[in-house]
Amino acid sequence: MFGAGDEDDTDFLSPSGGARLASLFGLDQAAAGHGNEFFQYTAPKQPKKGQGTAATGNQATPKTAPATMSTPTILVATAVHAYRYTNGQYVKQGKFGAAVLGNHTAREYRILLYISQQQPVTVARIHVNFELMVRPNNYSTFYDDQRQNWSIMFESEKAAVEFNKQVCIAKCNSTSSLDAVLSQDLIVADGPAVEVGDSLEVAYTGWLFQNHVLGQVFDSTANKDKLLRLKLGSGKVIKGWEDGMLGMKKGGKRLLIVPPACAVGSEGVIGWTQATDSILVFEVEVRRVKFARDSGSDGHSVSSRDSAAPSPIPGADNLSADPVVSPPTSIPFKSGEPALRTKSNSLSEQLAINTSPDAVKAKLISRMAKMGQPMLPILPPQLDSNDSEIEDVNTLQGGGQPVVTPSVQPSLHPAHPALPQMTSQAPQPSVTGLQAPSAALMQVSSLDSHSAVSGNAQSFQPYAGMQAYAYPQASAVTSQLQPVRPLYPAPLSQPPHFQGSGDMASFLMTEARQHNTEIRMAVSKVADKMDHLMTKVEELQKHSAGNSMLIPSMSVTMETSMIMSNIQRIIQENERLKQEILEKSNRIEEQNDKISELIERNQRYVEQSNLMMEKRNNSLQTATENTQARVLHAEQEKAKVTEELAAATAQVSHLQLKMTAHQKKETELQMQLTESLKETDLLRGQLTKVQAKLSELQETSEQAQSKFKSEKQNRKQLELKVTSLEEELTDLRVEKESLEKNLSERKKKSAQERSQAEEEIDEIRKSYQEELDKLRQLLKKTRVSTDQAAAEQLSLVQAELQTQWEAKCEHLLASAKDEHLQQYQEVCAQRDAYQQKLVQLQEKCLALQAQITALTKQNEQHIKELEKNKSQMSGVEAAASDPSEKVKKIMNQVFQSLRREFELEESYNGRTILGTIMNTIKMVTLQLLNQQEQEKEESSSEEEEEKAEERPRRPSQEQSASASSGQPQAPLNRERPESPMVPSEQVVEEAVPLPPQALTTSQDGHRRKGDSEAEALSEIKDGSLPPELSCIPSHRVLGPPTSIPPEPLGPVSMDSECEESLAASPMAAKPDNPSGKVCVREVAPDGPLQESSTRLSLTSDPEEGDPLALGPESPGEPQPPQLKKDDVTSSTGPHKELSSTEAGSTVAGAALRPSHHSQRSSLSGDEEDELFKGATLKALRPKAQPEEEDEDEVSMKGRPPPTPLFGDDDDDDDIDWLG
């Protein structure tokens, strides 16, 4: 009987029309004035009429009730296109409704965006500091209570102006006292903003602000022909206009709300002179502007309202009252407001159901408005049934209604279809017998005390048959009174609200009394109806007694007796129900007393909790501001630290590369030092042998004269052999050129490979740059959120990327090292092959040299010169022994100075180590230079005296002697930055009297070997050299290295050197020397030392096996490795000492020259010319050494360290490289 209407529960409170905003606030009662169709009477012929339709009229009566303090009203509502600002751009959310809601008594105003009445989108509380930023093209932006930026576009300019105007009025209403001018842009325009001193023509309209809205219009330019002209800052208008119109632009419109304090100017008010204490509202539009500032200045005075500054953080009272899923009619909870709840809800249900206070207030207001009004409408007069049937139906409905209604649960619908405003009407008396107790019973849930009443409803079942016979609508009506379940669950994230007020207990008591009176009235009506029914039954019995027969009369009497028994039973049950109702009413009063106590206690708790929440919200706000500031600071520091880390890693890689290069330099210098020591030992042995052979040469000189004539004939034969050897030499030169071409091709290949490697490195850098850009974007995203999990994830990602970066860098470094190692091994293999060829050429040259020396040893002039210079040999021996001791002394001095700079247990940076080593080497080098300059000055003075003595005796060899004596000091004097080129005349005149074949072959072999090694090593280092450098190859012979051959300074200087040497070649070549040009291009690495050793070897006896022939140029001796170009700076010290050895050997060679003159005097002129002609022509190669030494000394200043594989080596620019 009571469970047949479950299908219609969801439609009980559904609206009849669309989702209109007016249904939220009780403005659509005019459309619902026809009553609730569920409670209309229908004839038995139409039992189901109107059951499926929606009901919207159960709250139609109080539509004229005035508004109360707890009901929000709609100030303006319109349709907008909403955009939400996410990830740096506005994303369209669709077409929403936008409304400004306000409660004037509580001074609370809000902007609401909603999709429908059940789906609110966002809420923004309007306060004095709230900013609604107006944009062109009907756009406006604001921040909601969750600090989310929204942009809304109105469909028309009129709607935008009205909405903005209501927002400004709401800002004014939200404060109790207005102290400053409030302004709100209604329409924004482009162009410069007005400032103080500008002249304006404005159109305005002024209202008085009355009862929270715009009141009477007291002045306007709409009815005037001319606009108002004014000048800002002149004082002729009120202060509110002076302040409020700053920053406006031509064509812009603004709403100004001026308090009384700002409504008077220095010279009165503009269009009205009466004094007023009201707030004035102006709508001002700028029509024309004349700027006072110059036309060239471009200053823009923009007020704060035009900026995009975010609105302030919402107050503490908004944090818990406005969840995301709150209903659109929600108003934030505020301490001091009466939080009304339904009387019949139990405490557990009140705590479990998290409804917003606005919904509870709206329901309570609707219940109070319907107090004492009929639930059922007045029946129309055209019903077919008689009065008794109507009365019986009304009796059943009136008696059954209180039984059914307690089981109806309250609806948790977020937007009630009609929210009537509270009325002050008293309960009205019932008009007819169809009045129900109260409509408020339809919206409350049952208390435990009502369960008995609902259980006793089964006592009315005997009337079911009668209802089905005459009034089938009764069951349909009761079926509609089932509990209405909520149409959507309560919001899960919303905290429970605690409400309470002082007048709640009195209100509940009055409502309980009204319920009791209504129940008593209903019971009395039931008793009256029963008495009326009894009288009718008695009349029927009397009427049918005389007219019916026995059998019908017995059936009638049986029927009436059954009816009478039922009536008696009903009367007894009615008495029992009356007693139960009295007991329950007493129990309800007790429960009401308890509820009032609990409400008072709850009120105290609510006040305390509100205070605590306010304190917590304030502390949370300060904490969040502090944390945001800290996060920003931490992010800035993080960016700085990442930049420093990148710079540090780059510097570490550079220093590691430098450290490896210096380690290689150190090992090579140590090898060179050991080899130089071995070479000094060999020179000592050779010097002792030369002394022993001097005595033998005295004996053999007598035999040399007799053999001279025979050897003269042999000389012609040897000249023929020399020509053949020269042909072989040309062939070897062709081979040399082919090998040089191969080397150049290999250099080009290495250059291409290096360029490819650099391109790969550039691509890797670009990829790393893209990864860094992505990381920066991630950093920007993480700055918005303060979630710690996101920060940890970011740190993990950064750590992984850093490890990947380091792994990739190590992998690339290893691959680059492998490539350079392979190239170095290939060049070493080529060098070994060239060395083998060089050994073969040296053997041929040595054989020829032995034959030539056998001829020249027979000259008596050498014997006489050696006898004269015996006293000078002791100085030569001492000079030869000096280099080893000096080398030891210098290295010991370097070691001791470096040892003082470092401690064994300390760790040092690579930059500091490099700088210390460079300073130490520089200091030792400068000390040696000072000593060497003194020695050079002494030796040069002695040699000049010797040259002065030899010039009258040797006119043909005057230039040769001067060049040989002066040339050894050239490398010493030119050891510092200036190193000019050696003149080609000296190269030609510095000739040793040897046959051209030996010198050509030996020097060509040395040149090839030096070429192969120097170019191979330079190819490893630089990858490619300019083609001009092929004309000046690097040479090396067995002997103490005078300098470490570096790479020339550049292609320009080498071109000039080649051009000078080639230009001097015609002067160097004699008429009978066909290979003069080639000799100019050949450069000897160790000119002075080779010259002296060659001159000493001239006196060896051919019968003794020529022990000196293999001394300086023995192919079996290991030759010192040629260092790289960047190792020049580390070899300054040993080079200086070995230069002293050259000076000593040169002195010995100069001492031998007088013997040549004596020998020449004993011979005839023709024979002498024939003997020394060819040797003089070919003597160019040994003296080309100063030119190369000059180049070496220029490069002694040091070339910068090699460019690292990764990154720019800008950090090393500040190191003064030995300069």
Swiss-Prot record:
Keyword terms: Acetylation, Actin-binding, Cell projection, Coiled coil, Cytoplasm, Endocytosis, Endosome, Phosphoprotein, Transport
Biological processes per GO annotation: endocytosis
Cell location: Cytoplasm; Cell projection, Axon; Early endosome
Single GO term (MF): peptidyl-prolyl cis-trans isomerase activity
Main location: cytoplasm
Coiled-coil stretches noted in the UniProt entry, renumbered to this chain: 522-789, 818-878, 925-951
Biased composition (Polar residues): 53-66, 421-433, 1090-1100
Modified residues (N6-acetyllysine): 92
Region called Important for function in growth cone organization, residue ranges: 72-169
Modified residues (N-acetylmethionine): 1
Phosphoserine modified-residue sites: 14, 23, 307, 311, 326, 344, 346, 356, 619, 939-941, 956, 979, 1024, 1056, 1061, 1065, 1097, 1114, 1158, 1161-1162, 1164, 1195
Residue ranges of every copy of the PPIase FKBP-type domain listed in the record: 197-290
Annotated region described as Disordered, given as residue ranges: 41-66, 294-349, 381-433, 739-761, 931-1219
Annotated InterPro entries: FKBP-15_dom, PPIase_dom_sf, PPIase_FKBP_dom
Biased composition (Basic and acidic residues): 1123-1139
One annotated Gene Ontology cellular component of this protein: early endosome
Bias (Acidic residues) ranges: 1207-1219
Quaternary structure note: Interacts with WIP and actin. Interacts with TBC1D23.
Domain text: The PPIase FKBP-type domain seems to be inactive both for FK506-binding and enzymatic activity. The central coiled-coil region is responsible for association with early endosomes.
UniProt family annotation: Belongs to the FKBP-type PPIase family.
PANTHER family, alphabetized: FK506-BINDING PROTEIN 15 (PTHR44927:SF1)
Free-text function comment from the UniProt entry: May be involved in the cytoskeletal organization of neuronal growth cones. Seems to be inactive as a PPIase. Involved in the transport of early endosomes at the level of transition between microfilament-based and microtubule-based movement.
Protein's name according to its UniProt entry: FK506-binding protein 15
Organism this protein belongs to: Homo sapiens (Human)
Lineage: Eukaryota, Metazoa, Chordata, Craniata, Vertebrata
